C-alpha cells in the first residue's frame, strides 16, 4: 500500500511538473526575451544650439559612440568612438559645431564603465576628436614651450556651457589625490587652454555658475563627509558659508539662480518627510519653501529651456510621473502643459531646445514605451517623430504596469507596480 501511495504521489508530481513546464513553454513562446534585453538604439540626445544638428550616443557592442545627424534629413554627418570598452559619460554642445564629451572606460570586472575624467571635443562636420583634458592629452611634447593644453593627472566635468560665449565653458577640475580640492576653470573649446576662475575652501566641490557666467555657489564635503554650501556675491568677493551640515543637520544642495540672480534655489533635507525645494534670498539670508510633496522627494528639477537657465519646477514620481511648478508665470509652464495634453497617458520631457527657442527636442515615455524622440516646433505647434530608443518594440504589444499600494501590518504604506497581462 505504501508503494502504491508513493507511486500515486510521484505520478501527481510528474504531471504537475509537466503542466508547469508546459506553462513555461507557452510563456517563453509568448515573450521574446531577446528583444527586451537588447540594448537601445539611442541613449542621450541633444539638439545643437542653431538647430542644424542632432547629437546622440549609440550603444554598440563593446563600446558607446557619438553620432551627429543633420536634422533636416537625419543623415549622419559625423561619427566618433574611442574604441573597445569605452563609453561616453556625458556630452554637451559647446557651440554650433563642437561637442564636448566625458570619457568612461570599462576596466576589469566592473559592471559599469568608470568615468576617467578626460574631456574630448568632437567636430560635428567631420567627426574628428581631440582630447583637451587628461593624462593622454597631446601637448606637443618637449619640442615646444607653447602649450595651450597640457597633459595632466586630473579629472574634469562640465560645470556650465556658458551660452553667452560660444568658445568657452566652465569645467570642474580636480587632481587624482586622496584629498582633492576642486577648482573651476574656464576652457577655450578650440585650443583647450584653461584658466582658473575660482578656488574654494571645501573638498569634492561642485560649482554653480550664475547667468552672467560667474561661479557664485559651491557644494562640497570634507573628510567627515558632512556637506558645506558656500556663496559669493561676485567673482571678486570672498566665499561665505551658507550651510554646514554639521550644525544644521541637513543637506542643502544648490539647484540654480533665479533670472535676476537674487535668489538661490536649494534642495533641502527636512526633519521629517520628503525633501523640499527652498528659495534662499541672498540679500536677507531668509529661506522659504516653494515646492514640496507630501509623500515623495523631487525626482528631477525642471529648468527653463529658454533664457536664463533657472529652476522653475520639479518632476515627482508617486506611481506615475507628474510635474509641479513654483514659477507658474514662466512661459515654459504652458509648453509643458500643452505637451502633457498632446501626449496624454505618457510622460513628455523637454530634452533640449535651440538657442532661439523655436525647436524643442521632446522625449516621450511611459510604462509601455521605452522612449520616443519628437521634434516640436513651438511656432507651428507641430511635432515630428524622429527616432525611438527601441524601435523593434511596439508599445501596443507591451503589458501595462499599474501603480499599487497597500498598508503593511506595522502601518507602513508600501508602494509598488503590478504588471498586468496583455488585455487583462
Positions of predicted regions on the chain:
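Secondary-structure transition/capping motifs at alpha-helix termini
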Residues: 283, 379, 422-424
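Bacterial N-terminal signal peptides
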Residues: 13-24
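N-terminal secretory signal peptides that target proteins for export/translocation
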Residues: 1-9
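Beta-propeller folds
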Residues: 29-360, 366-369, 376
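Long amphipathic N-terminal alpha/beta scaffold segment
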Residues: 365-366, 374, 382-383, 392-394
Amino acid at each position: 500500500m505504501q508503494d502504491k501511495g508513493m507511486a500515486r504521489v510521484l505520478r501527481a508530481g510528474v504531471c504537475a511538473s509537466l503542466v508547469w513546464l508546459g506553462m513555461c513553454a507557452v510563456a517563453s513562446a509568448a515573450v521574446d526575451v531577446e528583444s527586451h534585453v537588447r540594448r537601445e538604439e539611442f541613449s542621450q540626445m541633444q539638439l545643437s544650439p542653431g538647430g542644424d544638428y542632432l547629437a546622440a550616443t549609440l550603444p554598440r557592442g563593446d563600446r558607446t559612440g557619438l553620432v551627429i545627424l543633420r536634422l533636416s534629413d537625419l543623415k549622419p554627418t559625423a561619427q566618433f568612438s574611442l574604441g573597445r570598452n569605452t563609453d561616453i559619460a556625458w556630452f554637451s554642445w559647446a557651440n554650433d559645431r563642437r561637442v564636448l564629451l566625458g570619457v568612461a572606460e570599462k576596466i576589469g570586472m566592473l559592471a559599469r564603465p568608470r568615468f576617467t575624467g578626460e574631456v574630448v571635443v568632437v567636430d560635428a562636420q567631420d567627426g574628428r576628436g581631440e582630447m583637451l583634458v587628461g593624462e593622454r592629452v597631446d601637448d606637443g611634447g618637449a619640442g615646444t614651450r607653447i602649450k595651450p593644453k597640457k597633459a595632466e593627472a586630473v579629472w574634469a566635468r562640465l560645470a556650465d556651457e556658458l551660452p553667452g560665449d560660444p568658445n568657452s565653458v566652465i569645467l570642474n577640475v580636480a587632481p587624482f589625490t586622496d584629498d582633492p580640492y576642486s577648482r573651476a576653470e574656464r576652457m577655450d573649446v578650440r585650443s583647450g587652454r584653461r584658466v582658473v576662475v575660482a578656488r574654494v575652501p571645501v573638498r569634492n566641490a561642485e560649482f554653480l555658475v550664475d547667468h552672467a557666467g560667474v561661479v557664485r555657489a559651491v557644494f562640497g564635503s570634507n573628510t567627515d563627509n558632512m556637506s558645506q554650501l558656500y556663496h559669493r556675491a561676485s567673482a571678486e568677493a570672498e566665499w561665505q558659508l551658507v550651510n554646514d551640515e554639521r550644525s544644521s543637520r541637513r543637506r542643502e544642495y544648490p539647484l540654480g539662480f533665479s533670472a535676476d540672480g537674487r535668489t538661490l534655489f536649494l534642495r533641502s533635507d527636512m526633519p521629517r518627510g520628503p525633501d523640499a525645494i527652498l528659495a534662499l534670498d541672498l540679500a536677507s539670508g531668509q529661506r522659504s519653501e516653494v515646492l514640496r510633496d507630501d509623500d515623495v522627494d523631487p525626482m528631477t528639477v525642471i529648468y527653463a529651456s529658454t533664457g536664463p537657465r533657472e529652476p522653475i519646477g520639479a518632476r515627482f514620481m508617486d506611481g506615475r510621473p507628474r510635474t509641479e511648478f513654483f514659477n507658474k508665470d514662466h512661459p515654459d509652464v504652458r509648453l509643458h502643459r500643452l505637451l502633457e495634453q498632446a501626449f496624454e497617458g505618457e510622460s513628455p520631457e523637454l530634452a533640449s531646445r535651440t538657442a532661439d527657442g523655436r525647436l524643442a527636442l521632446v522625449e516621450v515615455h511611459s510604462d509601455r514605451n521605452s522612449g520616443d524622440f519628437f521634434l516640436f516646433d513651438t511656432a507651428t505647434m507641430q511635432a515630428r517623430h524622429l527616432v525611438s530608443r527601441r524601435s523593434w518594440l511596439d508599445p501596443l504589444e507591451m503589458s501595462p504596469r499599474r501603480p499599487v499600494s497597500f498598508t503593511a501590518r506595522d502601518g507602513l504604506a508600501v508602494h509598488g507596480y503590478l504588471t498586468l497581462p496583455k488585455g487583462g
